[in-house]
Amino acid sequence: MWLQILFLVLSVGRIDAAPPGQSRVVGGYKCEKNSQPWQVAVINRYLCGGVLIDPSWVITAAHCYSHNYHVLLGRNNLFKDEPFAQYRVVNQSFPHPDYNPFFMKNHTLFPGDDHSNDLMLLHLSEPADITDGVKVIDLPTEEPKVGSTCLASGWSSTKPLEWEFPDDLQCVNINILSNEKCIKAHTQMVTDVMLCAGELEGGKDTCNGDSGGPLLCDGVLQGITSWSSVPCGETNRPAIYTKLIKFTSWIKEVMKENS
């Protein structure tokens, strides 16, 4: 059943809620098998990434909002039979209340736009089975540091402005930069609930289809992919990630009230 859903999504154009999620892994590499067991593929009209933070809860980007979701867990390759693969239906979604709902339908970036609070919680109809290939990851407890080495992951296009999508999960190594770097790089708002990450020399980035996926810095989940420039991976155009340390209280409150 889930393979039919996935093929349908790909047949109509495997795109994410573009540009706020201009998030594809560019300049990356094939992730080591089962090295990202919290990675989730969120399937609706688009393909987005997500992160398993509790057996019953996935966090993703608010601009990935839709009315029906399915999630794939424990997958390295989206199309091959894999021993740890699981499929779940989402029965409730909780976009952050301060995210601008206009951007849930309109995904074009304009100068001055403020995409703050770009995160959403998805409640699974049945908890995930925790195995060697499916694991939860803890929320951050400390601020990420500028210069931290980070890893982002996803299944989306590996070349800027081209629809070349890998079957296998891709990883890319980038660094946390000061928000001032992103303020200079973008005409959109860069706020204190966002993280700036990438490589100023370009060539490494997240892009179309990775939105909502994890950003791990020094092994700690610190962000989820939000938006970047078009095309991605350009020189002096680092990407923007939702800064999770700013939202841990809200996340825990939603999970507690709706479990």
Swiss-Prot record:
Residues 19-24 form a propeptide. Residues 25-256 form the Peptidase S1 domain. One of its GO terms (molecular function) is serine-type endopeptidase activity. Kidney and submandibular gland. InterPro entries: Peptidase_S1_PA (IPR009003), Peptidase_S1_PA_chymotrypsin (IPR043504), Peptidase_S1A (IPR001314), Trypsin_dom (IPR001254), TRYPSIN_HIS (IPR018114), TRYPSIN_SER (IPR033116). Gene3D superfamilies: Trypsin-like serine proteases. The active site is at H63 (charge relay system), D118 (charge relay system), S211 (charge relay system). This is Glandular kallikrein-12, submandibular/renal.
